[in-house]
UniProtKB/Swiss-Prot annotation:
Lipid bilayer topology: Multi-pass membrane protein
Family: Belongs to the G-protein coupled receptor T2R family.
Known function: Gustducin-coupled receptor implicated in the perception of bitter compounds in the oral cavity and the gastrointestinal tract. Signals through PLCB2 and the calcium-regulated cation channel TRPM5.
Cytoplasmic compartment segments: 31-55, 116-128, 209-235, 288-319
Transmembrane in keyword set: yes
Protein name: Taste receptor type 2 member 7
Gene label: TAS2R7
Ranges annotated as spanning the membrane: 10-30, 56-76, 95-115, 129-149, 188-208, 236-256, 267-287
Organism: Pan troglodytes (Chimpanzee)
PANTHER family named in the record: TASTE RECEPTOR TYPE 2, TASTE RECEPTOR TYPE 2 MEMBER 7
Amino acid sequence: MADKVQTTLLFLAVGEFSVGILGNAFIGLVNCMDWVKKRKIASIDLILTSLAISRICLLCVILLDCFILVLYPDVYATGKEMRIIDFFWTLTNHLSIWFATCLSIYYXFRIANFFHPLFLWMKWRIDRVISWILLGCVVLSVFISLPATENLNADFRFCVKAKRKTNLTWSCRVNKTQHASTKLFLNLATLLPFCVCLMSFFLLILSLRRHIRRMQLSATGCRDPSTEAHVRALKAVISFLLLFIAYYLSFLVATSSYFMPETELAVIFGESIALIYPSSHSFILILGNNKLRHASLKVIWKVMSILKGRKFQQHKQIG
């Protein structure tokens, strides 16, 4: 029964992976083509491209981990070859979260309107420093990933190996103090970008409220370009926060799975849920970006035209 559930979850993971690769590759391809054409790249496009690349890598690592867990359980339990995968999963996980946080920060500074001197100073300089912020996210993610992978996953692999030999939950002996400190370190490292996104969300809400109030007082209506920009940014930030919560819970299931009777099943279940975040959020970003949305509509229109042309040719040959 457990094998059937694992196989079903694996097929689900493959489907989520395919959808995620399609959306994120589209974002990266459109922005890179625009970069080559204009010989420069806008800050928002740089953030979206970095986010798309990190999520493509994250999707590949998670799916590879799923395949090895189901098809090669002995390799999964050894802890030697898997250390590389563990490192890249932790790295791409934090890169994806921090790049999404950079996107939220960018929305807050570019769209929100406040007259505090510090906010205005940062608003005017955000385009100049965004590449350095992204580079800092890479350095920070590497700094977090190296010790976390070494400590946390060593205990996890040992536990999986012990359970496969004895089939008893209590046979797993890990250093709980070290494990708890590593989990606390990972949780705090993940909680920081979440809090930053939450602050960006509240800034956008407050800015939108003040803007609508000004528009109502001037009797010019509420549906102006600034309001639309606020709403699009809020949709992107809210979707990230909700999907991030689901992803974080699935991450907790996967990393805490050796306290459960069916470790392998808990891991692949957590990974299947985790794939939803990098897969679905890319399409929300496409719909919220004018250039990406128009490019996607062009692609859909061309595909429909090709399909209609093929149907016409088939009917012509039959007739």
